[in-house]
Every structure is written in C-alpha cells, then in structure tokens.
Amino acid sequence: MIQEKFKFYKPCKLLQPYIRYYWVFKSNRPLDAFTYPIGCPQIIFHKQAPLYIPELNVTQDKLTVSGQVNFSSHLYADGNTEMIVVVFHPHAMSMFLNIPTSLFYNQEVSGYSLENKSLNELATRIFDCENNSICISYVEKWLVSQIADNLADTTHRIKRIDAAIQRIYITPQISVNELSSIASLSKKQFERLFHSFSCV
C-alpha cells in the first residue's frame, strides 16, 4: 500500500523570528520531484533514505545543512523516505550554527562535517525516536539552547538585518546605502553583517 504524509509545524513564539516552520515528510514510494528555491536555509534530518540532487551531483547526508540556492532542482529517492526539516528565515541560521550562512550558498553540507557536538547529539536523538512530534520538540529545545547565551546581542543584530530585508521585499531595487541607513550602520558594517546572516 502506498503511503505519503506531509505535515507542517509552527515554531514556538520565541523561535518565530528565526524559524519559518518545520515540516515532516514520510513516503514509502520512490520520489521524483522538481523544486523551486525558497530563499531559506534548512537543516534536514533523514530518518530513512536521503535525497539525491542531480544538479549538484550529491546525495544528502542523514544530517544535512542545505544553504540558500539560486536554482531549481530535482529531488530523487528510491523510496522509504522520512525526513524532518527545519526551515530558517533567510538571515537566521548562522546564529544557531555559529557559521556564516553565506558559506552554505548553493551547497548541501553534511551536518557531521561541522563538528558541532550538540547538533550531532540532536541528530542521534531524532534518529532514535519514532514519534516525529516528539522529534520536533527535541529540535525546538536544541534551537532555544543555542540562542540562550547570546540572545540579546543576536536579537538586536537580527532586527537590524530584518528591517533591511523587509524593505528589500517592498523595494527590490533599493541601494545598499539606503539599506545601511535603515539598519543604522555604515555601509561596510551593514555589508559585513548582512553577508554573515544571509546570501540574498
């Protein structure tokens, strides 16, 4: 019997400025899908068969960090797919991984290669848990723990960049000088901060 299940989860209020949503996908049949870029980096936990992306000639790892991409792509799996995905706002992933988001641009990186002990432990907990709703709660606890120490500073920096990104949505042809003014930063400071949070 063919079974497919797709479910979205809303992040807790504290994480909503950083996380767009979580989603879980389960299927016991082969997958052949065409996707469009959404502009958001993701952390992907493959509980079963990972996805193959021919445009990059890469099979995702069980724990994958997927950067922002500027191209559409195909996704293939042989069947028995089960994945949990954390979808970040374009500028937010770096605060959880302590790595500039720009380093993941157009890439699928093994989460294990980041040598992040707490992320690896989270992956183990997720892979050992059958209940995906509980897995989402594990993810949320991990995300909150990652921002607890530097929340005030990071929140201030995120608000500056978020204001600029909101303006880009309204006026796509806006100049960098105007954006830096909105963020109350010099052009050079703005470019550095914007690039560390986003690849847009």
Residue spans for each PLM region:
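Alpha-helical bundle regulatory/interaction domains
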Residues: 1-161, 166-177, 182-187
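Extended amphipathic alpha-helical scaffolding segments in membrane-proximal extra-membrane regions
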Residues: 176, 193-194
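A secondary-structure capping/hinge motif
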Residues: 194-200
